[in-house]
Amino acid sequence: MAGLKLLKSLALHDDKCWSVDVNNGGIMATGSTDRKIKLVDIRSFQIIEELDDTAHKKTVRSVAWRPHSNILAAGSFDSTVSIWGKDDDGYNDENDLETELLAIIEGHENEIKCVAWSHDGELLATCSRDKSVWIWEADEMGEEFECISVLQEHSQDVKHVIWHQSLPLLASSSYDDTVRIWKDCDDDWECCAVLNGHEGTVWSSDFEKSNSNVRLCSGSDDGTVRIWCLEDDNGEYEQEWIQESILPKAHTRAVYSVNWSPKGYIASTGSDGRLVIYKESEDGWIVECIHELTHGVYETNMVKWVEYGSKDVILLITAGDDGHVNVWKFDEN
């Protein structure tokens, strides 16, 4: 029977921890209501650096590493995005230079809820309470950003954005109970599909890490996790997506975060504090394991699989309202 083992509980923040991300060098970044961004070595669990908390006036809601780099984006409730970077030597014992603030991106009119890099690191997507998604083109150094598209078809607060790992597709999740799929159409980003079915805010979504299927999982205020599948892509402006399945009911309250692992597992967590692992079988999706009180009596805001290190060791990271980041080992057997 699969199970979860807590490897380390890191008391990193004085208030809610909202977001975590780990780069390919094993450096974890965290963002919090206390406005601080902390960098932690996932191997030693040691804090490497605390970034200047004067960069943001309010909550740091989302952090995301640019792929294959030492450049970090952080989105804040002060409606700005900060970009941080370190030289090519990266985070090692010999490099004692501080991470620099490279840029501040402005444009949104309200709280930023999520930031996400495209798989090639050329584009940064941001979403906000102002109901919009912005797409920015970044230079190689992470110092210059040009807005190339503003997407305004959601009718409410946009909670989350995520890019497909290889295709030019972006998914956005919203308080309007929908997920929208966007694609690059002749250098102009267009909404090619609206995924309807959830009966509450869609807090998070994630694409399957597969080269054969284009599928998306989503988690909602209605307590469900759903799977969506691309059925038809005419190559132009519209795509046909279907709701493939609703995963077995395992949450009693809102699902805040979902994440699809390279091995095919889906992890979800949320307001009830549960960490749930799902597995696809020949007969459909099953609940592989449930861990109660992931952060004690506090809500769990985010879950993320870690692709760093040995392929034989599967790690999960959760962030909670207690200000802690918990590192878990997932045992498939």
UniProtKB/Swiss-Prot annotation:
Gene3D superfamilies in the record: YVTN repeat-like/Quinoprotein amine dehydrogenase (2.130.10.10)
GO terms (BP aspect): iron-sulfur cluster assembly
Protein name: Probable cytosolic iron-sulfur protein assembly protein 1
Role, per record: Essential component of the cytosolic iron-sulfur (Fe/S) protein assembly machinery. Required for the maturation of extramitochondrial Fe/S proteins.
Manganese keyword on record: no
Gene name tied to this protein: CIA1
PANTHER family assigned to the protein according to its UniProt record, in alphabetical order: CYTOSOLIC IRON-SULFUR PROTEIN ASSEMBLY PROTEIN CIAO1-RELATED, WD40 PROTEIN CIAO1
Source organism (scientific name): Kluyveromyces lactis (strain ATCC 8585 / CBS 2359 / DSM 70799 / NBRC 1267 / NRRL Y-1140 / WM37) (Yeast)
UniProt superkingdom: Eukaryota
Lineage, highest ranks first: Eukaryota, Fungi, Dikarya, Ascomycota, Saccharomycotina
WD repeat copies, ranges: 12-50, 55-94, 107-146, 153-192, 197-238, 250-288, 298-333
Keywords, comma-separated and alphabetical: Cytoplasm, Nucleus, Repeat, WD repeat
Pfam family, any one: WD40
